[in-house]
Amino acid sequence: MKRMLRLALTLCLLASAGHCAAQAIVRKSFARAERQTALLDSLLTAPDLFPASWNPDGTIKTNTARGWISGFFPADIWLLYEYTRDTKWLDMARRRTAPLDALRRYTKTHDLGFMVGCPCHLAYRLTGDDHYKQLLIDASDALLTRFSPTVGLIRSWDNKGGDPNPYRVIIDNMMNLEMLFTASRLTGDKRYHDIAVRHADNTLKNHFRPDNSSFHIVCYDAGTGRVTGQKGGQGHSAASAWSRGQSWGLYGFTMCYRETGDKRYLDRAVKSA
């Protein structure tokens, strides 16, 4: 009996030590994130600029609110506020999210989930401020203008001259469906949910090869919805897997399973992994 008690005590101590070590890693990681975020904020020379990458000379490369990654930096700041509850991050998050108001009715991109949905969902969840809720809903309405009932998918890029063909859809679009599911929950309007599901279903049908890798781009005929081409895009070739695209599909279909409970989506996520 004493042996069992000693063994149990030893296991408890080891588990406690492991938990403490993990917590120390988390604290260290967030401390570094705070330093890096404060530095990035100080390098932005205007309130409506967002960090993009770095120039060869070591200076920061920035983008405007219309850049597809504009929502990432504000979202990171909201996450810092959630972890630390330090109001300096709350103030910065509000300030860096404010320029995204300009995207409220912007219909020229499929990336509104990245740009608006990501930071505004966090902002609304953490503050309860209806301004962020409405901004997310308005951006969702803008995204729906890019949906074709004939094709059954949200168009990615527009063509020069307004030519309807090819109707191009990229695997990245799966990431933007999360905003539509959120809008459906916030409004009770099933339209957002149904369009997200239809887009996911057609992506499931046409975007994957037999080896479970995904095409970056699938082209459709806007008038018939027929597939006219499947391309590698940012991958090495039309026949290769593109790692970032695989991750878009992996996250996107996992999220769709969470939102719908449809096991087909979970199966696709597992196969993508």
Language model regions located:
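Bacterial Sec-dependent N-terminal signal peptides
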Residues: 1-24
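Glycan-recognition and catalytic cores of secretory/periplasmic carbohydrate-active enzymes
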Residues: 22-273
